Each structure stands twice: as structure tokens, then as C-alpha cells.
């Protein structure tokens, strides 16, 4: 897989990361900082742009979904991979996250990138096989950070 370099002009845009046509606002961006001041905190690491989103975006350029796919982004966080799929492949993306506090950040990122992402607050372990059938593709990046998540993730893969 060819590695995609991040924006070489990053020094002129210190609060934005440009990658594969997506503008990702960093946690230092004034609008992001404003949202952070309005919240009491995050419970599940949804507090910044995670580099794993860019790795997954790179992967998806090599193995793209069908255009206009129904996509579930498990542990979507600020939604950068969701935004990439919506913009690049006209995907209808639902971002799922256990942290309701990420939704304003996801919507801000989507607004900056002129696309829409559906947000659903909840855990993947509660999704049924029937619910999963509504999606053509299920993606996730950097979500297995607690040992007790391994078995529920395996169940998700089996049900999908």
C-alpha cells in the first residue's frame, strides 16, 4: 500500500490536518477548543484526532467500498473515516460511539468537510445480527483498548 503523506503545508495551517481531501480540525483548533470548554469531558478517548483514522483511510483507498454503500463506523470518535467515506464514495455512514460527547465534534468535522454523518450513541455489543444486516460495510479503528472488549468484538465480527 502506498503511504499517503500528510499535507506538506501543515505549518501554515497549524490547527488543521489535510489528508486525502479531508480537513481534520486538531484539538487545538479554536472551534474545537470552544466545544471542549462547553463539555465536562469525555469518557472513552473521544478527545482528539486519532492517527489510526488516517491509516484506515489509506487502507480504504486501496480496498474501497462500493459507491453509496451503507457503512457503520464503530467507535467513530470525531468521524474522520466516516467523513472520508461520505465524501469520496458517497457512502451513507452511521457513526456509532459509546461517548455521546463526541457527537458535537463529529458534526463540526462533518460541517467543515461539507457532508452529513448520522450519529448513534451506544455500544457495539448491543447491536443485533438483524441490525448489522442494514450495513454493507462495518469499519472500526483503534477501538480495542480494554481487554474486556476482545470477546464482544469477536461476537460483532461473527454476527456481521
Could you describe each region identified by the protein language model?
Residues 1-160:
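S-adenosylmethionine-dependent methyltransferases
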